[in-house]
Amino acid sequence: PGQSRTVRFVLGWYFPVPDRVSLGFLRGSDTLRRQYGGRFADARAVVEHVAGDLDRLEADTRAWVKTWYTDATLPHWFLERTLAPASTLATNTCYLFDDGRFYGWEGVYCCPGTCEHVWNYAQSIARLFPQLERDTRSRVDLGIGFHADTGQIGNRAEADMAWATDGQCGTILRCYREHLTAPDDTYLRANWSRLRRALEWVMDHDAGPNGTLDGAQPNTLDTVWYGEIAWITGMYVAALRAGAEMADEMGQSEFADRCRALAESGSRDLST
């Protein structure tokens, strides 16, 4: 009685098998496991790992906080807004499966498919774990969700193979981003033929052609818009410019010139 002591404890959990009902539409869902299931045998093993490496884990965490906040010269409101979305990775919105596939809902258990028209606006993962984004572009957007006959990308891959205009333009931009963060041009060369076809699919919806999109434009607001829409046309123009840069690197100058001409036309339209 009257004494006190400090006790450290770790709250650990281990649920390597995801909910296969809600994820039943995913390819191979009947055997998918969380990636950490291959690293640890049970919750005790997780706790023992934390306990055995606690000093380093704490030191790395403190170093991150010091680097990002204490030593930063940027305003804190900017730092908060930049990093806060990364916390989503630690929720049940996101999964990393044992086959290496990254998957994300729009929100926890809501709206499937790592959907383009939501996730193309996210930036945190690409900067923190660029290899995950490169794999998702190749495996999902230009793989599982890709219509090889047309170039259309299924907005939600297996869950919905229809397209979203802002989503497909955004995915082309993401592919360029993934190339820019890659150590060499291997990623671009492996994906270029499908990436070009995906851009050509969007260009097919430019009836002019004049650098602006026409007809139905399904988008992230869960609706379909028509006509010249500055926001979506702006994404189309950006995708054209990204496509031109990649085409140049691939030695396809004629296609690059075509993309730039449309982008210039679209930019003029946006400014008037």
Would you name each region that the model predicts?
Residues R194-H205, M235, A242-E245, L262-L270:
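Alpha-helical scaffold segments in carbohydrate-active enzymes
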Residues Q3, V7-R8, Y14, R34-D206, ...:
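Substrate-binding groove/exosite segments of carbohydrate-active enzymes
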Residues Q168-I172, T233-R241:
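Hydrophobic faces of stable alpha-helices that mediate helix-helix packing
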Residues W13-L23:
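Short, Lys/Arg- and Gly-enriched loop/turn segments at beta-strand edges
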Residues R189-R196, G215, E254-S267:
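Beta-strand segments within the central parallel beta-sheet cores of soluble alpha/beta enzyme folds
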